[in-house]
């Protein structure tokens, strides 16, 4: 196989991919190079960038090219070259990079290396390849392409003259601490009083050991005795022939003992601790009033005046006081209280009696509500009640007509503003209960003289009830709990004969309802059997000829109920 130089101007390189690469290359004998520097354009403002190295294959041969030259290999076999290639195979197999590869692809790479090493004609030399290889392996900084920088990198390196940001206002040399992190050197939680006393003793000892002779002014005697500093400074000998600098002050002496470059100890720094952590001793000359604890004897005015600041007060005489202008008279507003008479509609408040007046007609309806002699369930005569109501309505209407000024009158009708309706002036109102017959009930005392029995038979247990009392004569008499007045009337008497009752019954009750009422009454009597004493004052016998008034009987019969209620409530509390 022979290699000849390839002209790049007339070469049409086919577009191939890595999969289409033909690696079955025959051996070749000789090789030639083609210089690419002839096609380099003349130097201008822009530099020339050589093309990268590439490998192209076709049916006729393979083309190898780099930045300086191009090579073309033919498919003609040569037996003389096989021995050299075998030697190269043995040499390349020693490297790990060229192992476990395909034979055809390895041959192409070997051929490329062989052409580079064997080429001696032309500008391409082995030294150029070695320099490029060394340059790629070097770890020095290389010029890179410009990458997009962040906003922090784009900030100016120097401070702007007119900038008022917080970063420019801070000094660059000072050390900044976060506000959330306090300076631990300023806060010492443990108060080391013993070390402070020792330090005071050391200072007193140093001042005592400094003795300056005013007559000679040529010697300084100093002696340091400290447990912490050791015994390496036991003292100084007399210094003869050396003049003393009189300009040395006490501050310079202190700076000599404590150089400026040394950091101050935490004990010398001020402690920021509240006075509540100390046990403050009462001392009027040293302590401020803010540090004093409150004493009980400070409640007097004299003790409190001791804390006032003494200032010169100028007293102005009343004669020299003059008003700059006329004073404004404020409006006097009356405050509403219980002594202020008021009016609201037709009602007038009387401050003397502290009551509202003007509704006496309305209050008259409630005058007989709380009377003591009023019967609770007494039904009045309907005719009398209707007559009273008509008179009251007529009087109210006449009063309303007399008092009202702006009355609306249309024809024979007048407006009733209280009930919001039209009323005839001449005619009276129609009675809505006209035509209903009245029921006149006889007195209760006369109707209950005869005792009535229930329409059903009683059992033996019910007959022998425990609610009996033994009289002195040995005759059993019924108690008030057993002999209740019946609220109903039956058709059967004690002898079993049917008689027409004197009073017609108002309500018709069935025998089942009457039996239910009877059993409930007996059950109630059993529960209250042990709560009463026989022959009590509240006991009312049915056999008595004279029966008291119904209101008096009911009041006596119900008087014990509140006593029972109070006893039950008190028993549950215990």
From Swiss-Prot:
Multiply phosphorylated in a cell-cycle-dependent manner with the major phosphorylation occurring in mitosis. The keyword rRNA-binding does not apply. One of its GO terms (molecular function) is GTPase activator activity. The modification Phosphoserine is found at residue 317. To S.pombe byr4. Residues 161-173 have a biased composition (Polar residues). GO terms for biological process: cell division; mitotic spindle orientation checkpoint signaling; negative regulation of exit from mitosis. Present with 1380 molecules/cell in log phase SD medium. This is Mitotic check point protein BFA1. The gene is BFA1. Keywords: Cell cycle, Cell division, Cytoplasm, Cytoskeleton, Mitosis, Phosphoprotein. It comes from the Eukaryota. It is found in: Cytoplasm, Cytoskeleton, Spindle pole. Part of a checkpoint which monitors spindle integrity and prevents premature exit from mitosis. This cell-cycle arrest depends upon inhibition of the G-protein TEM1 by the BFA1/BUB2 complex. Residues 154-173 are annotated as: Disordered. Its main location: cytoplasm. GO terms for cellular component: Bfa1-Bub2 complex; cytoplasm; mitotic spindle pole body; spindle pole; spindle pole body. Interacts with BUB2.
